[in-house]
A protein has these predicted regions:
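Short hydrophobic alpha-helices and adjacent helix-cap/hinge residues
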Residues: 2-8, 22-165
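Bacterial N-terminal signal peptides
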Residues: 9-19
């Protein structure tokens, strides 16, 4: 007995969907991480540095898996300023960035007033570290690293963190 054409097509479609599931999950993780970063910015208390009329610069590498998802927030407001994702290589100083998104292996720049450093993966020196695990994205907060850059976090953000250092 041979399978019907419908059953053959159904099995082929199911197999294709299952093969694509890990890629979809990866894409979803990247979008979630970008949304986390946008919300981190919303729940950060920034020092008054006279930048009220300037764009809210989010610096990252275009090679980062997060790049296009971070760009999807361009134009959205953060404390009355428009989010603008830019290539870190085009900034003369990392301190020009309101948020600096680093890959796990990227070198940490010197502290800069008003700059929130978020690292995607384990590492030291960032104020917020995104952590993958147990099918969830979690984050750790280093309040000392934030304080070095003149930043404070909302208690709401701190309550959601996996660890607060």
């Amino acid at each position: 007995m041979h399978p019907t054409p419908f059953l053959r097509h159904f099995c082929l479609a199911l197999g294709s969907a299952l093969a694509c599931a890990p890629a979809y999950a990866q894409l979803r993780d990247v979008e979630l991480k970008a949304a986390f970063i946008y919300n981190f910015a919303q729940f950060t208390v920034w020092p008054d540095m006279g930048r009220a009329r300037e764009p809210f610069l989010v610096c990252a590498s275009p090679d980062s898996a997060l790049w296009s998802s971070l760009q999807s927030f361009n134009g959205k407001p953060v404390n009355g300023r428009a989010w603008n994702t830019v290539d870190i290589a085009t900034r003369p100083r990392p301190g020009d960035c309101s948020v600096l998104v680093l890959a796990r292996s990227a070198e940490l720049p010197a502290p800069a007033p008003g700059m929130l450093v978020v690292r995607d993966g384990a590492g030291r020196g960032a104020a917020i570290i995104l952590v993958d695990g147990d099918e969830h994205i979690r984050f750790d907060v280093d309040t000392e690293a934030a304080t070095r850059n003149g930043l404070r976090f909302s208690s709401k953000l701190l309550r959601l963190a996996r660890n607060v250092l």
